[in-house]
Amino acid sequence: MKGKLYGIGVGPGDSELMTVKAARIVGEADIIITPKTEKKDGSVALNIAAPYIQEHTEIVPVVFPMVLDDATQEEGWQEAKRIILSYLDQGKSVVFLTLGDPMFYSTYMYVYRLIENTGHEIETIPGVTAFCAIGSHLGYPIVEKEEVLAIVPATAPKEKIDAVLAVADDAVIMKVYKNFDEVQETLIKHNMADDAVMISRVGLPDEQVYVGLDNMPKDTKLNYLSTILAKRKDR
């Protein structure tokens, strides 16, 4: 009997934002795969899912190198594939946890592609994205009527972000942690900084909220889990 792989989005931080289905499957799992980096111990996704994990479940941390080198990344994905397949071949139910939604800026997508043609059943359970949680948490409408919404990673080239914000009415900027000064500059240029909001680690105990990004110090230190919502004032 072959096992089954579940990709589960645990949402942005609050365990109660996990879907009923996600919580049930986590509670029934034989194996839970928790992605981690080489530099950090622990897993935010695992902590979010923890209230639903049963004693019989085995937790298996898998390292995914946070590097730009394609060969090193591929090596990490292949190792994850090997580990997951070893459990699936034993008939185990395997859960791969991911923050937010599994198909939105997630490591799970790469593992999914490697395993989808191996003959094993896969089911992906959606989760609440950080930007949707922030909009609801702060009462900040993300996009309205015929407005155009842009979703961009702050890690993209500056000129690419600039071009996108030039035509967008509203913006979601993900992964704001290393280059806040460049992002801030671009938001100011396109008249989107004054009413912008940013949350680091939304739904977690150490959540930080920033309202109005035009006057924030350029050297502000931010967590990797930081997201900006912005609107153009002249439209």
Model-found features: residue ranges?
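General beta-strand structural signal in soluble alpha/beta enzymes
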Residues: 34, 61, 96-98, 124-127, ...
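Short gly/pro/ser/thr-enriched loop/turn and capping motifs at secondary-structure boundaries
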Residues: 39-42, 67, 129-132, 180, ...
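Class I SAM-dependent methyltransferase SAM-binding "motif I" and its flanking Rossmann-like core
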Residues: 103-167, 233
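A contiguous loop/helix-start segment that scaffolds small-molecule binding in enzyme catalytic cores
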Residues: 5, 165-235
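Solvent-exposed alpha-helices and their adjacent loops that cap or buttress functional pockets
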Residues: 1-2, 24-25, 88-89, 96, ...
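A polyampholytic, Gly/Pro-enriched intrinsically disordered region
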Residues: 79-87, 142-153, 215-226
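Cofactor-binding loop segments of dinucleotide-utilizing enzymes, especially the Rossmann-like FAD-
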Residues: 37, 99, 154, 176, ...
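Class I S-adenosyl-L-methionine
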Residues: 1-15, 20-22, 27-120, 209-210, ...
